[in-house]
Regions:
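Short coil-to-beta strand junction motifs in C2/discoidin
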Residues: 150-157, 228-232
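Cysteine-clustered segments with highest specificity for TGF-beta superfamily mature ligands
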Residues: 191-222
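Extracellular carbohydrate recognition and processing domains
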Residues: 168-203
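A short beta-strand element within beta-rich, extracytoplasmic domains
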Residues: 136-146, 154
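Proprotein-processing/basic-patch segments
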Residues: 217-247
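Beta-strand-rich, repetitive solenoid scaffolds
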Residues: 2-6, 10-16, 20-51, 55-61, ...
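Short carbohydrate-recognition loop motifs
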Residues: 103-118
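Short beta-strands within extracellular/lumenal beta-sheet-rich domains
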Residues: 116-132, 137
Length: 247
């Protein structure tokens, strides 16, 4: 039976008189939720109802999270992809040098791309971006290690372009976005740049397309004062999703 009278007020209280559920009315509303109990072996349901297609918006407070079974529920939002230097390749023209550098025997070897201090050099990689990506801008961080104790600034840049089925791959990259990180002063120390500004992917990014990336060191820029090779260990790409999965 639909309860029309008496009308429920703005809240429902528990047996102690404390608020259990707060209710907010919307003028001329057409969408609502339906609560259904269930027989043995079945789960009760909370269903959005009203118009033909209605989302269900559950909003936690402050830094709270949506939970299921006591654990946070994964929702659409900011995600990361890690690209190690071993998954990149030096550009045919002015390519960075792919190297394997030993620290101490039986300790971690470093798979790196060496970017020169005096010449702009490039490396490339590609990703078939997840279907859940919102096709918006990206950001990135560079993970690297210095080849000297110099503490000058090192400038890295990243640019990208998306290609669909039957598109030519002989296409110009999008506008580069740079990030600057100062040498830490100790050889073989781990360095992680700050997160870059927004990188716009050229082309017409869409689900299922392959995105090509070009990473470079802007060694010829006046602001790049790091006087040795910058040894890139990898790049972390940040992207935003607008779907819970890639179905």
């Amino acid at each position: 039976k639909t309860l029309t009278s008496p009308k429920i007020g703005t809240n429902i209280l528990d047996t102690n008189g404390n608020e259990l559920i707060n209710l907010t009315a919307t003028g001329s509303s057409v969408n609502e939720i339906t609560l259904a109990n269930a027989a043995t072996g079945n789960a009760p349901t909370i269903t959005a109802s009203g118009e033909t297609n209605v989302s269900l918006n559950l909003v936690p407070k402050g830094t709270g999270t949506l939970q299921g079974g006591g654990s946070a529920i994964k929702i659409a939002g900011k995600e990361t992809i890690w690209i190690p230097s071993s998954a990149m390749y030096p550009a045919t023209t002015n390519g960075a040098a792919a190297e394997q550098v030993e620290t101490t025997a039986t300790r971690p070897d470093m798979k790196v791309l060496d970017f020169d201090a005096s010449t702009d050099q490039f490396a490339q990689f590609s990703i078939a971006m997840p279907k859940s990506w919102n096709e918006g801008t990206l950001t990135y961080q560079v993970y690297w290690t210095p080849a000297s104790t110099n503490t000058g600034d090192c400038i890295f840049g990243l640019q990208a372009v998306a290609c669909a089925d039957s598109d030519t791959i002989d296409v110009v990259y999008g506008t580069a976005v740079t990030v600057t990180d100062a040498g830490i002063g100790t050889v073989e120390d781990q360095q992680i740049s700050s997160e870059s500004g927004a990188v716009t992917v050229a082309g017409s990014p869409a689900a299922g397309e392959q995105t090509y990336f070009q990473l470079y060191r802007d060694a010829n820029a006046g602001g790049d004062t790091f006087s040795a090779n910058a040894r890139v260990l990898g790049v972390k790409i940040f992207f935003t999703t607008d779907a819970a999965n890639d179905a």
